[in-house]
């Protein structure tokens, strides 16, 4: 699928929201991409992950890992298509870690996934977990890079959509100055 088809998919599933949003990064934005609204449809999740899997099918990935909650479905479906394990990290006392008996064996090839990448903060936390377990990060994959291609994670990044969606520091946010109420739609509690 091409970029326009993916954007239309987000519109058709009401996953492209407009308003005043507090992002997981702490920044503010007038647009928010709620990938869960797309991924709730198994056929769309399969299609998205099939397109992503094409880029990694020859890399012998052992594990796909992403942060809970946003990347759990993405990680699972991508791992299913790559015929490997899927695990996720989650926050405990504000720190991202592996729980539920999940682990990464030394030397395992790991694909890190996130639904939407803005600053890459959650992805960097996952990369650190992989390094702690002595796994090998092969690449990072996502549905949307909303940094416009500016985020550098130190590993190859493959997303289906690269968009430049303006974000604001809270103290510089024009939406705050206009008094527009802010909404925090994501899963991370700050």
From Swiss-Prot:
Its cofactor is Mg(2+). One of its GO terms (molecular function) is orotate phosphoribosyltransferase activity. It catalyses: orotidine 5'-phosphate + diphosphate = orotate + 5-phospho-alpha-D-ribose 1-diphosphate. PROSITE patterns: PUR_PYR_PR_TRANSFER. The keyword Transferase applies. SUPFAM superfamilies: PRTase-like. Signal peptide: none annotated. InterPro entries: OPRT, Orotate_PRibTrfase_bac, PRibTrfase_dom, PRTase-like. Pathway: Pyrimidine metabolism; UMP biosynthesis via de novo pathway; UMP from orotate: step 1/2. The keyword Magnesium applies. Homodimer. Catalyzes the transfer of a ribosyl phosphate group from 5-phosphoribose 1-diphosphate to orotate, leading to the formation of orotidine monophosphate (OMP). Belongs to the purine/pyrimidine phosphoribosyltransferase family. PyrE subfamily. This is Orotate phosphoribosyltransferase. It comes from Caldicellulosiruptor bescii (strain ATCC BAA-1888 / DSM 6725 / KCTC 15123 / Z-1320) (Anaerocellum thermophilum). The gene is pyrE.
């Amino acid at each position: 699928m091409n970029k326009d088809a993916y954007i239309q998919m987000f519109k058709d599933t009401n996953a492209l929201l407009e308003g005043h949003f507090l992002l997981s990064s702490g920044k503010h934005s007038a647009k928010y991409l709620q990938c869960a609204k797309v991924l709730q449809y198994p056929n769309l999740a399969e299609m998205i992950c099939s397109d992503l899997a094409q880029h990694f099918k020859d890399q012998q990935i052992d594990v796909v890992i992403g942060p809970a909650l946003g990347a759990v479905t993405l990680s699972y479906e991508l791992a299913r298509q790559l015929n490997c394990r899927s695990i996720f990290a989650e926050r405990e006392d504000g720190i991202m870690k592996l729980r539920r008996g999940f682990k990464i064996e030394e030397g395992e090839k790991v694909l890190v996934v996130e639904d939407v990448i803005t600053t890459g903060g959650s992805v960097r936390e996952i990369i650190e977990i992989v390094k702690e377990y002595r796994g090998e990060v092969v690449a990072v994959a996502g549905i949307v890079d909303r940094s416009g291609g500016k985020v550098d994670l130190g590993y190859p990044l493959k997303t289906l959509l690269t968009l430049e969606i303006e974000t604001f520091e809270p103290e510089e946010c024009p939406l705050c100055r206009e008094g527009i109420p802010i909404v925090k739609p994501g899963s991370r509690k700050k």
